[in-house]
């Protein structure tokens, strides 16, 4: 099974100079990021709903990556097709940037974790500097809940059929980490950077 659009070529990322991060780590100038991911309560006296299992990825800040992410978000407003392509494109761009960091030998600067049952997360031992936090939370939704007109379906993955959808909430934050400090971040559904609907597809049966 594949996410529609995920197979398309991601927008190339521009490698980030990691020398400052390595120097900070070598000198012991490290800090961290903690936070909580949750849905805000819509009723008085009703507790917030933690989004356990949300994925949190922290990467060295790249102005190039931020610009490209914002461009995908802006383009998503152009049409229904662009909106459906946005979620897979955002994920593909993040993964391409992770791979560039790994390939450059900076695998230790790619940090990831998941939110616990209460929605809390912690990313420790980050060298002091500017970082980019990208968090995602996916919920499987009914196959027909987000379906468009038949002519709009399957435009990204020929010879496949739709098996379902994921509603993906995405948070994008720029964080400055300082020595000996832990930056606290609350990520709520209302404060999400982008909400995507990602198609799940499987290959058509061969005849």
Regions found by a protein language model. Name each.
Residues 1-5:
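Bacterial N-terminal signal peptides
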Residues 9-207:
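Long luminal/extracellular ectodomains of secretory-pathway precursor proteins
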């Amino acid at each position: 099974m594949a996410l529609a659009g995920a197979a398309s070529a991601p927008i190339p990322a521009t490698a980030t100079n990691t020398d400052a991060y390595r120097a900070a780590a070598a000198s012991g100038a490290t800090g961290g990021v903690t936070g909580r991911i949750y849905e805000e309560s819509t009723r008085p006296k009703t507790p917030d709903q933690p989004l356990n299992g949300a994925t949190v990825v922290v990467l060295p800040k790249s102005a190039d990556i931020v610009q490209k992410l914002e461009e995908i978000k802006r383009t998503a407003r152009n049409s229904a097709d662009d909106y459906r392509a946005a979620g897979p494109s955002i994920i593909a761009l993040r993964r391409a940037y992770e791979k560039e960091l790994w390939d450059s030998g900076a695998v230790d600067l790619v940090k990831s974790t998941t939110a616990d049952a209460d929605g809390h997360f912690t990313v420790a031992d980050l060298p002091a500097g500017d970082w980019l936090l990208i968090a995602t939370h996916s919920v499987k939704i009914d196959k027909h809940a987000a379906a468009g007109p038949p002519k709009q379906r399957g435009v990204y993955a020929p010879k496949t059929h739709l098996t379902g959808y994921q509603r993906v909430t995405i948070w994008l934050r720029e964080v400055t980490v300082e020595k000996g400090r832990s930056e606290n971040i609350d990520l709520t559904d209302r404060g999400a950077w982008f909400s995507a609907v990602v198609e799940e597809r499987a290959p058509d049966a061969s005849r």
